[in-house]
């Protein structure tokens, strides 16, 4: 939005031309989202306490989690607000990719909001019925995907980039829709499953979003895209602003969510952030890199799938409890140790993912 204002004001003061640079707006988006989160955080927490929007805890979970019962939840609304305001302020709103990102972010946020609200009003951990939850997640994902397919079905925007192989970039055609669906819905659920300990999901989210900001910038720069042997995507450079807004909002939320947490993001935050990461990966054609850099999310989701599958087939559990972070808790690891070690792993995976861009 401010890009348009700057274009007008530059006639009177050339300094406003700085706002036209994507790097400047990306940094400002990060700082804006960060400061908004820090500013509204205490107000949101207080309001959630007044409304008695407290966390419900599984009866079969680790005993240490019983103390978390009643901690304000649905703090994800402050994340969404911070990202939304920052993106609308600093992004070029003529870019269709920005609207696709915001659509998925707030679409999944709305689904998570309803899910959280039902848990709170029912005083248990049962939210939306699973089939309805997946139905609405699918609707949001498919609308976004068809929108993107219409924008770029005959360009590099629908090619599949494979790490380490610079000359293998097949045109996906209609399979683009299928792959994109699983990326968005899968990432939304994976981040949601990871959000079980204080700060566990939000830091990897910030790290992955920061990495995608760099990738989006390179993908939207024809010279760097050619140098790295990745597709040049016309609209992708503006996604940098959206990604840095996620980083800023995530760090601001972490201020209140770090152990011991003052607030939880709830499904309204985790589903929205997961969906946002998924759609960004699709926009910059780096679905495989999402699997690498978001490895913590992948392992958390796989641990649940394996646990459920093993119990149904063999009546035996692989882990003491799933998702896998609870397994380590039940082994005796203190919660902060689990969190920090998962953060370290996430940082290593993000760096590995970035390195693959050059190893081609």
From Swiss-Prot:
Keyword terms of this UniProt record: Cell cycle, Cell division, Cell inner membrane, Cell membrane, Cell shape, Cell wall biogenesis/degradation, Magnesium, Membrane, Metal-binding, Peptidoglycan synthesis, Transferase, Transmembrane, Transmembrane helix
Cross-referenced InterPro entries: Glycosyl_transferase_4, PNAcMuramoyl-5peptid_Trfase, PNAcMuramoyl-5peptid_Trfase_CS
Transmembrane segments: 21-41, 73-93, 94-114, 132-152, 168-188, 199-219, 239-259, 263-283, 288-308, 338-358
Pathway: Cell wall biogenesis; peptidoglycan biosynthesis
UniProt xrefs under Pfam families: Glycos_transf_4 (PF00953), MraY_sig1 (PF10555)
Presence of the UniProt keyword Iron-sulfur in the record: no
Record's subcellular location: Cell inner membrane
Broadest EC class assigned to this enzyme: transferase
Statement: the UniProt record of this protein carries the keyword Magnesium: yes
Signal sequence region: none
Cofactors demanded by this protein: Mg(2+)
MF-aspect GO terms: metal ion binding; phospho-N-acetylmuramoyl-pentapeptide-transferase activity; UDP-N-acetylmuramoyl-L-alanyl-D-glutamyl-meso-2,6-diaminopimelyl-D-alanyl-D-alanine:undecaprenyl-phosphate transferase activity
Predominant localisation class: membrane
This protein's GO CC annotations: plasma membrane
GO biological processes: cell division; cell wall organization; peptidoglycan biosynthetic process; regulation of cell shape
Family assignment from sequence similarity: Belongs to the glycosyltransferase 4 family. MraY subfamily.
Name this polypeptide is given: Phospho-N-acetylmuramoyl-pentapeptide-transferase
Protein's organism: Haemophilus influenzae (strain PittGG)
